Amino acid sequence: MPAIVLIGAQWGDEGKGKATDLLGGRVQWVVRYQGGNNAGHTVVLPSGENFALHLIPSGVLTPGVTNVIGNGVVIDPGVLLSELKGLEDRGVDTSKLLISADAHLLMPYHVAIDKVTERYMGSKKIGTTGRGIGPCYQDKVARMGIRVADVLDTDQLAHKVEAALEFKNQVLVKIYNRKALDPDQVVESLLEQAEGFRHRIADARLLLNNALEAGETVLLEGSQGTLLDVDHGTYPYVTSSNPTAGGAAVGSGIGPTRIRTVLGILKAYTTRVGSGPFPTELFDESGEYLSKTGGEFGVTTGRRRRCGWFDAVIARYATRVNGITDYFLTKLDVLSSLETVPVCVGYEIDGKRTSEMPMTQSDLCRAKPVYEELPGWWEDISAAREFDDLPAKARDYVLRLEEIAGAPVSCIGVGPGRDQTIVRRDILQERA
């Protein structure tokens, strides 16, 4: 069986956890391939139980599925252990969670530098979560990072931490006037934490490719979204990794020819957290309505999300840069009771109209949305389970979004629960 990539097609928070949870019972492996605990997935089980996950793949909530934290993820050991304990305390079996030996570990000095840098930047700050994700990826690229496998060799670990702190302490003390970190204490603390996860360390590349050879299905789960990709997003207001489909192969060790389906998760309106351009952002009662009705607060940060109407320009862009084959449209139910629903079909920049993503961020910052008004619907759609159960105007909205986004809408979310989903096309069956 081929691998399936699940990606966010906007600025994150599209509902990827719901999609993974829906597919989880029909796949054998779920892999998180990038990011860290700077993002969160919310999963609501049929029982009504609500789980917020930050590092661990959403498939952990589906019995029998093997979950992998891939080499592209940066792992805060303390957060990992805390999340595991939280799941186990609620009766979740975590025995089938594995961690790639090549994933990088987020160290105390990454968090310290991230926080003081953000404060130092003041009004020029990017708006990071302050969890050390960026500094950890910086060390990875600079070839001075600490990898999961390093905890298996105490001498090697001590040498690497000491070398890293020779520089990091200079930054903390001389630039930011903070206390230096003691290498021995950092190593001792990490080794204590490693006792809680060393039995999970694995050669993930080998296991995943063996699974595909054996005919098993692997779901590659991204965090954040396309417009937060360090290469293809609204730079510099982005994350430090590649949430796009191209990052799935790199962050998991699965070759790109193994991937057949790219499922884009697309919210029926648009949100983003933090700073950066957002052409359809609303500052009126409509924005307040979307925020309140959609419960738009970050799983990880608790920050209120900025809200706006659906933006077909970024949806088409996401389709193109990810090679999206299918869309999962979420939170359609939030739009119920609106008289009309505007949809952005293009931008006007300096008097010129375009239907494509601007090449420069300065152009995107000046972009004014060009709207197409679609009729709304008043009916409660949360109990709909077939496409024909939806009101005609809701169906028309979906079909129009499908047309302007450039890929078929195969699934539709009409509520937070796993069962509150309309499946128009069976992605696993048709792509097998």
Swiss-Prot record:
Which annotated residues bind IMP? D13, E14, G15, K16, N38, A39, G40, H41, T129, R143, Q224, T239, R303
Q: Which GO terms describe its cellular component?
A: cytoplasm
- Tell me the SMART domains matching this sequence: Adenylsucc_synt
Cofactor binding summary note = Binds 1 Mg(2+) ion per subunit.
Binding-site residues, GTP: 12-18, 40-42, 305, 331-333, 413-415
Checking Pfam families in the record gives: Adenylsucc_synt
Q: Does the keyword Membrane apply?
A: no
Biological process, per Gene Ontology: 'de novo' AMP biosynthetic process; IMP metabolic process
**Coiled-coil region list:** none
Query: What EC number(s) is this enzyme filed under?
Result: 6.3.4.4
Query: Can you tell me which residues bind Mg(2+)?
Result: D13, G40
Pathway in which the depicted protein is active = Purine metabolism; AMP biosynthesis via de novo pathway; AMP from IMP: step 1/2
Which cofactors, by name?
Answer: Mg(2+)
> Which compartments does it reside in?
Cytoplasm
The record's keywords, sorted A to Z, are: Cytoplasm, GTP-binding, Ligase, Magnesium, Metal-binding, Nucleotide-binding, Purine biosynthesis
NCBIfam families under this entry? Answer: PRK01117.1 (NF002223), purA (TIGR00184)
Biological role stated in the UniProt entry: Plays an important role in the de novo pathway of purine nucleotide biosynthesis. Catalyzes the first committed step in the biosynthesis of AMP from IMP.
Family of this protein: Belongs to the adenylosuccinate synthetase family.
Quote the protein name from its UniProt record: Adenylosuccinate synthetase
Species of origin reads: Mycobacterium marinum (strain ATCC BAA-535 / M)
Q: What is the lineage of its organism?
A: Bacteria, Bacillati, Actinomycetota, Actinomycetes, Mycobacteriales
Q: Provide the gene name from the record.
A: purA
